[in-house]
Structures are given as C-alpha cells and as structure tokens.
Amino acid sequence: MDQFLITGRSRIAGEVTISGAKNAALPLLAAMILAETPTTLNNVPSLQDVRTLIKLIAGLGIRIEKQGDTVTCDTSTIENYFAPYELVKTMRASILVLGPLLARFGEAEVSLPGGCAIGSRPVDQHLKAFKAMGAEITVENGYVKARAPEGGRLIGCEFSFDMVTVGGTENVLIAATLAKGTTVLENCAREPEVVDLANMLVAMGAKVSGIGTATLTIEGVDSLQGCEYSVVPDRIETGSYLAGALMTEGDVTTKNTDPALLQPVLQKFEEMGAIITTGDDWIRAQMTGRPKPVDIRTQPHPGFPTDMQAQLMAVCCLAEGTSTISENIFENRYMHVPELKRMGADIQVDGHTAIIRGVDSFNAAPVMATDLRASMSLVMAAAAAEGETLIDRIYHIDRGYENVEEKLRGLGVNIERVNPVTDAAEADSLDD
C-alpha cells in the first residue's frame, strides 16, 4: 500500500493549476446517461472516483471513454440498468446513476453505496423523493430496486428534503428533468457543484428554474440531448493549497479557479492574517508570521464548507492563540484529530466542537489518513513539520486530488510516494 514520505520545514510557495471539481464531475458524468445523443465533458479530473464511475457507466453497455481531461459518452448502446456492489461499494457517488436510469429507462437496480467513513450519510432522502414521484422502491439484499409507475415515466411532484443533502438534491434534480409534469424541490442544497449540474442539464435541454436557490422548479421534458460542457474548478483543492501558504509563511497562487466559489474560506484566511488577492480566475495567498486564531462553524453553502474543516484545523494548530471549530454537517468528522495530535497538536474535542490551542510547530511522526480531506490536512502538517513524516493509507488522497505529488513539488514540498512492499522486495532482490 502506497505511503507519502514528506520531509518538512518547506515554505509552500509558487503557482498551481487547479483541476476540475471531483464533486461536480461525478454528478455530471451520471447525468450524461439522460442524453439520447453523444455528450462531451471537459476539465474532468483524473481521479480514482472518476475512473470508478466511468467503469460503472461502461458496465451498463454505454460507450464512454476518457482522453486527457475530456470524457465522451454515447448511451445508444446501453444494455442493462444494473450497478453492482463490486463498483458501488468503493464510492458513495455511484448512487447518482439511480436517478438518470430510473428517469430515462423506467427501471434501475443499484447497490447501496460505500466509499466513505464520514458518518452515516443515508440515501433515504433520495428514495423518499423517488417514491413521491411514483416510483416503486424496494431494498433487497443490499440493492435498491426502482421502477417507474405504469407508462415508464416518473411523475412530477412537490417535495421538501428533510435535511439539506447535496447528493439527494442532485439525484432527484437529474430524475425530475424527464418526469411528466412539474417538480418543485424545497430545501435543496445550493453548493456550486449543484449549480454546475443544473447548468449542464439546461444545456442538454432541461427546463430548470431557481438555480442557486433552495427551491428548484423543474418542468419535465420528453427527451434530453447531448452537449459539450466543462466541469467547474475545484474549490476544495483550491482552498487546500492556499491553506498550505498560511501554515508555512508561504505565497501560493492558484490558477484556473473561481474566487466566487470560495468566499467563506477566503474570509477566514484573511481573519487569520493572510493577504488575499484575486482575479477572474486566480487567487493568491501571502502569509507572514503565525496565523491568528479563528472560530469556524461548518454550514451548508453559502456557509463554511465541511470539506475545508480538516485543512483549516491544521492551520489553527499553528495559530498564536486558541481557535474553535464546530462541525455541523457530518458526525464522525474529527478522525484526523488523533493524527494531528501525534504530530504535537493541542486539540480537545467535545461533541461537535473542537478546541485548538496553537503550538509553535508540528513534529514529524508516522500518521494515517482516515478520509479524503483529512489526508490533505496531514500532508500540509507534514510539510510544515520538522523532520520526516510517513503518511499511510494515502489512497484516500488519490480519490480527490489530481497529480498531488507533482503539484506539491511545484510548490516546494519535498514529497515522495513510497511502497513498503515493493521497496522491501527490491531490497531483497539486491541481497540475492
């Protein structure tokens, strides 16, 4: 299993080009199933989750391929509506194929998802909405079996989500585009990735209003056609690299990004003492001295994003004073705390709140990545630490950060990917 070996005391500085957002690319790929003619999607990141979803879509008999950062999809060859456990178990977003399959073909069988250690993240809101649209839903042996009402078409309805759910909003929005009649969705997620999905659906011929608000109105159409579309830049990748500048008195410019998508995070960076400058498609963070302490509460968009919580906690660990972070989106999202404490951080967790007392520096230590965003917080902490840090289970970071070693090296981080099993085998061969 691969590990990162990072030699610390780096000053993170330079320019880095931001990739397309994984959290936008996945629902966009799923939405391609709706189109009766070929679709082209640009700025698609090369990530494990993307490869998994492409493999799942190809398993339906659909012609789909990725060349560079472009994915093309032709659904005319579809053979089945079945998403097996072997693929879905590794990634929660696989459930997003349920909506388009059900809406376009009237039936679907999709394994219940896996792939995430952050709390329960139930899919009940997806299923509840599909039932409200007339679908017959059964869950048997770990699979969701869905069938549209007689006539093979979902029926528009009024539905209010019991909680703000990004995946639920996306799945139901996708399905509603081909429903008979009008669907009104209340308490929708407003994340930029949801907006990106709605915009692509409109480009395919869908009729969606209220984009970017908590209420979406979708007038169903008979069919959707393919289009050419580009994935929105990854705001979380952007924030992650900028956070590195704050931890190392660095100077980082992120290119091919959108400052408008990251305002709550940039505001906190400025509170912590960073100088933030922006252009149409770039953000620069300059830092001198130690960060100032801040208080952070994760909230649905447009609040502070939960996906930046771990990275900001790592910055707070080096602040000159005491910070507090309240995690209000997911339970069990402080799994990185024990690992940061192994590196010398002073953190106490009480329920949903973490109290972080700043220390002068991190110390190198062997640590383990526990989820995607936690893994990046450990990478940045290791870059700031004194000595060599070995980070285990880095497959998490490969799920969400494209070309991460190359980008970090370009910013001055001394990072190497190592494989203990392979390295040991090579050492044994030298002894023969």
Curated annotation (Swiss-Prot):
Chain positions found as 2-(S-cysteinyl)pyruvic acid O-phosphothioketal: 116
Entry EC no(s): 2.5.1.7
Subcellular location: Cytoplasm
Residues that hold phosphoenolpyruvate according to the record: 22-23
Binding site for UDP-N-acetyl-alpha-D-glucosamine: 92, 121-125, 307, 329
Pfam families for this protein: EPSP_synthase
A single GO BP: regulation of cell shape
This protein's GO CC annotations: cytoplasm
Pathway: Cell wall biogenesis; peptidoglycan biosynthesis
Catalytic site: 116 (proton donor)
Recorded catalytic activity of this chain's protein: phosphoenolpyruvate + UDP-N-acetyl-alpha-D-glucosamine = UDP-N-acetyl-3-O-(1-carboxyvinyl)-alpha-D-glucosamine + phosphate
Enzyme class: transferase
Keywords (A to Z) from UniProt: Cell cycle, Cell division, Cell shape, Cell wall biogenesis/degradation, Cytoplasm, Peptidoglycan synthesis, Pyruvate, Transferase
Family named by the database record: Belongs to the EPSP synthase family. MurA subfamily.
Name of the protein in question: UDP-N-acetylglucosamine 1-carboxyvinyltransferase
